Structure formats: C-alpha cells, structure tokens
C-alpha cells in the first residue's frame, strides 16, 4: 500500500491485510499508482468534450458536468484555503440527496479529503458518534439540517460547520478560482467512509 495522505487515520484504522478483499489480477483492471477518482469521474469527462452534458437532473434544474466541476473545484479551494484541510482529513456531509451534496462530495475528494455522508434523519446522538469515531473536524451542511449537527458539535471536536443553501458556503465559493489541481491521491487511498445502521 502506498502512502500519500498526510492524515493517515483511515489507513491506520483498516482491518489487518489478511482480511482485505481478494482482487482480480487482470491487467485491464489495474489502476495507476496515483489516481484521484474525481479526475476519472468528472475532470476527464469534461476534458473529453462532454462538459455541457447533464450529470444531475432535478425537478428545478439541470446541472452539467462543467458546472459540477467548477463548483467542486471552488469547494476544494474552500476546504484547503479557508478550512485548512489536510489530505486525509474527514469531512462530514449532511444533506438530502441533492446537486450540492454531489458537488461537496467531489470537492472533498479533489482536495484529498475523505467524505463521510450522513442521512438527513440522523439526530445529534448518531451524528456525535460518527464525528467521534471518524475524528471529523469539518462539516458541510444543508442549512435546513443544521440544528442536529450544531447540537452534536457541542460535545465533539468538530471545529467548523459550513452551511449551504443560500448561506455562507456559497459566498465563500463565489470568490474562489474555478480551477483546482486535484490532490495526487494514491489509487488505494480511502475517499469515503460510510457508516451504516446495520440494515
């Protein structure tokens, strides 16, 4: 396993190597040593000329790959420039399924962070457990869901909550460059932590 994330929390907490899943050793399934999945799933699509194609369609709006890339790049700048994100830091994402949730996820990955998405129904107690176990210090949160997260913050090491949905996060994004150089993660670096309820 290569090491590129400066905050090694995720690698340090993996199960023993003998419990890792078995992977195929077919050459066509090999990944390069350095791979940021945001480049593969977003940047490469735009570079190949598909930037104006829709990536997310909601009842209110249709979002293109180019728009998602721009917003993700600006979010990555907010994380690095304003929040002091260190590659490997976990970032809690609290929102319903939405365009902005996807943009935040890609922004976290571009910056070398690890996205920890939550369900909107989680209360302060469940959020607090996640924040503690994953040692989360930064959160992006839909302003409509802020109350439970703010309650969870009181007894945690969560330092920063940036709200979106007509709030401060969009203001911070608006002054950031539209380009971002993705953090050069290794192909085996963790990019998400998914807590489950056991269902």
Describe each model-derived feature in a short phrase:
Residues 42, 68, 72, 91, ...:
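Adenylate-forming
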Residues 39-67:
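AMP-dependent adenylate-forming
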Residues 61-63, 78-122:
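Conserved AMP-binding/adenylate-forming
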Residues 53, 87-89, 187:
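Phosphate-coordination loops involved in phosphoryl transfer and adenosine-cofactor binding
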Residues 1-36:
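Flexible, non-catalytic linker and terminal segments flanking ANL/adenylate-forming cores
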Residues 64-67, 191-199:
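Conserved AMP-binding A3 loop
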Residues 89, 122-152, 175:
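Conserved ATP-dependent adenylate/AMP-binding module captured primarily in the ANL superfamily
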Residues 176-195:
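Conserved pre-ATP/AMP-binding loop-to-beta segment of ANL
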């Amino acid at each position: 396993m290569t090491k590129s994330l400066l905050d090694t929390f995720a690698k340090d907490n993996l199960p023993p190597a003998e419990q890792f899943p078995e992977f195929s050793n077919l050459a066509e399934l090999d990944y390069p040593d350095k791979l940021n999945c945001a480049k593969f799933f977003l940047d490469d699509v735009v570079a190949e000329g598909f930037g104006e194609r829709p990536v997310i369609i909601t009842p209110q709006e249709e979002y293109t790959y180019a728009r998602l890339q721009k917003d993700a790049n600006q979010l990555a700048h907010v994380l690095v420039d304003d929040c002091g994100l260190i590659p490997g830091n976990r970032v809690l994402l609290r929102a319903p399924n939405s365009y902005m949730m996807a943009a935040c996820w890609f922004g976290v990955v571009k910056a070398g962070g690890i996205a920890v998405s939550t369900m909107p129904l989680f209360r302060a107690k469940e959020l607090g457990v996640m924040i503690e176990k994953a040692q989360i210090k930064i959160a992006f949160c839909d302003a409509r869901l802020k109350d439970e997260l703010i309650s969870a913050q009181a007894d945690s090491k969560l330092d920063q909550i940036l709200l979106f949905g007509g709030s401060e996060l969009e203001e911070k994004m608006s002054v950031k460059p539209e380009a971002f150089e993705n953090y050069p993660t290794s192909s085996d670096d963790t990019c998400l932590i998914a807590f489950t309820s056991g269902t």
